[in-house]
């Protein structure tokens, strides 16, 4: 009986301690780029111009500025 009461008290104490010591997320930045704005610039990629190698061919792969890739970036059809 005493052991059960001590275990219950210990669990309640540790639970309360966790809530008291937890960080308040309202004071922190919301997005990763707000945490370290310089790092977000590393993720920005430029597109490849016409006649540059773009890899596996498929439309709108995001590598070519024109959006057309057939092993090399091709100009947009008009």
UniProtKB/Swiss-Prot annotation:
SUPFAM superfamilies: omega toxin-like. Its main location: secreted. Residues 1-22 form the signal peptide. Keywords: Amidation, Calcium channel impairing toxin, Disulfide bond, Ion channel impairing toxin, Knottin, Neurotoxin, Presynaptic neurotoxin, Secreted, Signal, Toxin, Voltage-gated calcium channel impairing toxin. The modification Glutamine amide is found at residue 76. It is found in: Secreted. Residues 23-45 form a propeptide. It comes from the Eukaryota. Expressed by the venom duct. PROSITE patterns: OMEGA_CONOTOXIN. InterPro entries: Conotoxin (IPR004214), Conotoxin_omega-typ_CS (IPR012321). GO terms for cellular component: extracellular region; host cell presynaptic membrane. Disulfide bonds join 47-65, 54-69, 64-73. It holds the Pfam family Conotoxin. One of its GO terms (molecular function) is calcium channel regulator activity. Omega-conotoxins act at presynaptic membranes, they bind and block voltage-gated calcium channels (Cav). Acts on high voltage-activated (HVA) calcium currents in molluscan neurons. The presence of a 'disulfide through disulfide knot' structurally defines this protein as a knottin. Belongs to the conotoxin O1 superfamily. This is Omega-conotoxin PnVIA. The lineage of its organism: Eukaryota, Metazoa, Spiralia, Lophotrochozoa, Mollusca.
């Amino acid at each position: 009986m005493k052991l059960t009461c001590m275990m219950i008290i210990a669990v309640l104490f540790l639970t309360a301690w966790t809530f008291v010591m937890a960080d308040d997320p309202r004071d922190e930045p919301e997005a990763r780029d707000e945490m370290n704005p310089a790092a977000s610039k590393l993720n920005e990629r430029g597109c490849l111009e016409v006649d540059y190698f773009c890899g596996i061919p498929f439309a709108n792969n995001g590598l070519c500025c024109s959006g057309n890739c057939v092993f090399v970036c091709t100009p947009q059809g008009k």
